[in-house]
Structures are given as structure tokens and as C-alpha cells.
Amino acid sequence: MQKLIVVILAAGQGTRMKSSMPKVLHTVGDRSMLEHSYDRAKDLGADAIHIVYGHGGEQVKSALSHLDANWVLQQQQNGTGHAVEAAMPSIEDDALVLVLYGDVPLVRVDTLKSLVSAAVESGFGLLTAKLDDPTGYGRIIRDGDGVVKRIVEQKDGSAEELKTDEVNTGMLVVDSSKLRDWINALDSDNAQGEFYLTDIIAMAANDGVVINTVQPTSIDETLGANNRVQLAELERYLQQRKANQLMIDGVTLRDPARIDIRGQLTTGMDVVIDINCLFEGDVKLGSNINIGANCIIRDSILADGVTVMPNSIIEESQVGNGAMVGPFARLRPETVLKEDAKIGNFVEVKKSTIGAGSKVSHLSYIGDTSMGKNVNIGAGTITCNYDGTNKHQTIIGDDVFVGSDSQLIAPVTLESGATIGAGTTLSNTAPQDSLTISRSRQKSVPGWSRPKKRS
């Protein structure tokens, strides 16, 4: 069986992006466009991946140094044929070569599998598409029997040829030995003065090679981005694709056009997601979860039965069965909510464990805290965990009641069953099953009158 070698062309300057960053590093979803193309090559099980870079190449290599690929420098950008030629010394004979593009990120792996199969059958597979408006694309020219004969570029085509609505996507699979011969025979006698990879189509046809064509499931698979408008269009296509898959998997989206997934979102059954929610990184949702509008959830796990009220943020946290978050709550990294815990409006929790059934309902900050079960934290309570140099722990046992407007000066312990009176500033241990209170005794002054303004 022939090896599969993937060449990703990523040397374009991308001047229309008007950016100091190379075009292929601009992101769609959570990943650069080049990484999307690389991912598809890995999904195919490619035996080797060569990335041809040019403009801003060192910046590209530095940003994506984690990729398992051979980086090939194209010294001068003299067209797609010249770019593939730069990679040929690294490609062995008797292999299949798949050409992808670093700025065409949405091609599906199933489409590429079909393209590879087409090449296995005849030695040449070509991905084409039919467009309502093919302006700007190279046209597929067939003979009277429907056999592909050549590709003509927009600037080189006759008026009759440009009427053709079938276009070249640039993606192809070809035998490496034949590709080497055809690449060596390319010339730059065209309107652009460049070496077109598409010219090998006519060479293959003249050599009697049957060019099998494959068409994608949807046109967004073939689209690239040369400017920010097109980049935004790709983002919408990707998000719509992800939203559709969620709904197929049983998720209710109140508006599929108003959800963004920048990473991996996995869900159980009967999940409901309201509008304008953003999921980043690796997010796992259990079953019977309700997420309100305008929430951001990143790298977190939500167990079954969780409710997230509108305008809440959850970052690198774990939320247990039946817990409730929000509205307007924030869970910062390393927060764990046990089952049936509640974090209410305008509460921030950081690097803390909130025990089963415990409640922090209003206007509080809980940081670096270990909290037991069935604890009630009153409104306006603050764990004072930072002394200006170090963070300190607050330990709260089970069945503790903390009155409103209390300050817990860490390091400090509240033993199980302790009650803290409202307005307390606690700096020492609160004993078990006791009331602890530290505030000035109330005093009333009979007959007192307010000062009067001087005339």
C-alpha cells in the first residue's frame, strides 16, 4: 500500500489581512487556519506532513513548533507549483501526495478520504466544486465525454471557458513519481508569471491519466480567507457546523446562530443552552443541564442536573450534580462545587471547594477555601486570603452559618457547627457549635441632634 504524504502550502503573504501576523496564523474557532489543515492530515493518518512556508515563516514555525511536521522554506513565492516543488526533495517515490492549503481550514476528513480513494483508483484525484458565482476561481475544462482535460485560471480564460461553473479547489492527490515529472515540466508562461500547480492537470490528461473528480459535501469546505471579512465568514460556517452537530446529538439550542464553541464541547442528554453562550477549551456537560444566556464556560466539567443562570463565567472548574451557579457568578480556576451547592448572584469563587448543599448566595468572595457541607454564607462575606505577599487558607467545617458582611481573615478555621454573627471580622478559630461575634456593642444617644450648617 502506498504511503500518504501531505503537503500543506502556507507561504502566502496575506497582505489583504492587513496584519503583522502571517495569514495562516489567524484563527477559526480555537485554532489557527494552518492547524485546522494539519489536523485533517493527521486525521487521515498521513505518513508524513510537509509544511511549505515563506512570508513570516519563522513566526509561523515558532507559533506552531509543536506540530509534527517537516518545515520547507519557499525562498520566493513563485506560485503553487513552485511551492510544491520546494517540498519534492523530501518526498519519496511511489507515494500518494495530497496537497492542502494553510488558509482553507474547513475541509472534512470524509471528503479527503474520498479524494484519496479516487487517486488510488486512477493515480489522480481532484477536488472540484460547482459555484453559482465562480468568479476568481480556476475553471475545470472537460471534453465532450466529460473527461477533465485542463484547468484555466480566471486571468487566462476565454469568455467561453469562464462560463463554466465547475471550479478547482486546489486540493488534489497524485502519485509522487508522476507529480515530480510534471512539476519539473512547469513553466511560468501565463498572466501572473507564476508556476501554476493546476497546469499539471493538462499534463496528466496528455499522458492519458484519468483524473477522477470528487465534490465536497458543502461549499464551505473549499473556502479560504484572504481578508477579515472572509475569516469571519469561515468562523460562522464552523460555528454553524458545530451547532448543527450538537442539535443532532440531542442538545436544545435556543438560537443555533448565537453559540460559539472554541474547542471541544461534549454533552449528555437533554441539555438546553440559551443564546450568546461561549464554550472554550475542553468542556464536558452531563445530562439535564440548563445554561442561561450570555455565559462563558472554559475547560470545565458540569455534572448532571446543573443549572447555570445567565451572565455567569466558569473557568477550569468542576460543578457537581444538581448544583446551581448564578446569575452573574464567577467560578475561577480550581473551584469545585459538590452536589447541590449553590453559588448565587455577584459571587466570585477561586481555588476553593464548596461542600454538598452549601450556599454562597449573594455578593461574596470566597478564595483559597475548603468548605464543608450544608454551610450558609451570608451576603457580603469576604475571605481575606491575601496578605500582600502570600495567599492563605480558610477552613470551614460542616453546618457552619456565617452572617452577612463578615470578613474571614485567613489563615483561619471555622469549626463544624460554628455560627458567625453578622458584621464579624474573624481572625481566630471559631469554635465548634458556638456563636462567635466581633463587633462594637450598639450604643444609642438620646436627644442627640445633627450639627447645623454655619450661616
List PLM regions with ranges:
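Structural signal for interior beta-strand "rungs" in well-ordered beta-sheet cores
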Residues: 252-437, 442-443
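Conserved N-terminal catalytic core of the sugar/cofactor nucleotidyltransferase
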Residues: 1-5, 31-117
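Conserved core of the sugar-phosphate nucleotidyltransferase
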Residues: 58, 67, 107-191, 209
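Short catalytic helix/loop segments, enriched in acidic residues and glycine
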Residues: 20-36
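N-terminal nucleotide-binding beta1-loop-alpha1 segment
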Residues: 1-19
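Conserved catalytic-core motifs of eukaryotic protein kinase domains, centered on the activation segment
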Residues: 17-21, 386-387
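Short beta-strand/turn micro-motifs composed of small residues
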Residues: 10, 53, 101, 128-129
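Conserved alpha/beta core of the MobA/IspD/sugar-nucleotide pyrophosphorylase nucleotidyltransferase superfamily
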Residues: 167-268
